């Protein structure tokens, strides 16, 4: 509470579906500070552009996505994937559902419909 009451801007991360994002934003709004969501995309967790961006836009929360182009950081892989015993599961193939990232290294979209949705949400 002290930190939120004494900072100029609130920077949040939320990798949850839209309803959880809304609850988190509602809580942060009680501090009457501008809110920046600096990480939110986690497709396997239900946090997608299509579900979360409308909430962010409605609440006037500034936001940007952590990943852009699939590359050396391998943000298209889900982090902390572990088995029932807590052992890290290595990735042996390309994930069907990317975690972060929007574009392939050649600039083509991972999901063209998703890119069109992003464009539609960012128009004035």
Describe these PLM feature segments.
Residues 1-124:
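Substrate-binding clefts and catalytic carboxylate motifs of secreted carbohydrate-active enzymes
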């Amino acid at each position: 509470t002290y930190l939120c009451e004494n900072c100029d801007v609130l920077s949040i991360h939320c990798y949850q579906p839209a309803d959880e994002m809304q609850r988190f934003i509602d809580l942060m709004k009680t501090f009457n500070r501008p809110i920046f969501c600096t990480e939110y995309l986690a497709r396997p967790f239900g946090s997608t552009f299509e579900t979360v961006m409308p909430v962010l836009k409605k609440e006037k929360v500034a936001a940007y996505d952590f990943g852009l182009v699939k590359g050396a950081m391998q943000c298209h892989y889900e982090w902390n994937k572990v088995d029932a015993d807590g052992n890290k599961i290595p990735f042996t193939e390309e994930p069907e559902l990317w975690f972060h990232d929007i574009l392939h290294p050649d600039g083509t979209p991972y999901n063209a419909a998703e890119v069109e949705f992003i464009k539609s949400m960012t128009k004035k």
